[in-house]
Regions:
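Extracellular adhesion/carbohydrate-recognition regions
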Residues: 1-93, 164-170, 178
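An exposed tryptophan-centered "aromatic clamp" motif
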Residues: 75, 79, 83-98, 102-161, ...
Length: 181
């Protein structure tokens, strides 16, 4: 179930500057905090693909990934426009946002309606429905491809690194700390 997480002393103030983000549950028991500002971006220009030292991984390994910060940092170092966009945002309590794991990206596409319903209540928030229906993950598939959640098909697939897909700022939460509430 999605819910708005407010900054300290801002409960009920539905302006972008008063929220930490929108929290969603993931299939693996984790929670994720999404900042509702999005952009259609390339994951990586093909001329920079060799700067991303990450080896490609299988869909299963990408779905098992439980941390997005190191992968986002590697993409940022390689010159990723998508990583550059998402890392512009940070949470007072949780630090810098990153690109979603593949599982988180799939949950975003699955929970789009619920997320957008909450985003409509927040002044200044973007709606997922206004952007590309594929969401970049922080995982590489192969030399020229990255993993995306393909929203209209409800599945994961690979996409060329230089294709514009949605970059969604996200922080994975420590479930042992009961989210951020």
């Amino acid at each position: 179930m999605a819910r708005i997480i407010y900054k300290n002393e801002c409960e009920g103030q539905n302006r972008l500057e008063c929220i930490e983000g929108i929290e969603i549950d993931l299939l693996n028991g984790q929670k994720a905090l999404i900042y509702p500002k999005y952009s259609n971006e390339e994951l990586l220009d093909l001329k920079d693909r060799d700067r991303w030292l990450d080896a490609g991984i299988s869909e299963t390994r990408a779905l098992r990934l439980r941390d997005n910060q190191a992968a986002t940092a590697a993409l940022l170092e390689a010159g990723s426009p998508a990583a550059r966009f998402v890392t512009k945002f940070s949470s007072e309590r949780l630090g810098r946002f990153g690109l979603p794991t593949l599982l988180a990206a799939m949950e975003i596409t699955e929970q789009e309606g619920e997320i957008d319903k909450l985003a409509r209540e927040i002044d200044g928030a973007d709606l997922l429905e206004d952007f590309c229906f594929s969401v970049w993950s922080c995982s590489r598939y192969y030399k020229y491809y990255g993993w995306v959640a393909y929203g209209s098909g409800g599945c994961a697939r690979s996409n060329y690194l230089d294709t514009e897909c949605m970059a969604v700022p996200l922080v994975l939460l420590d479930t042992t700390a009961d989210g951020v509430a």
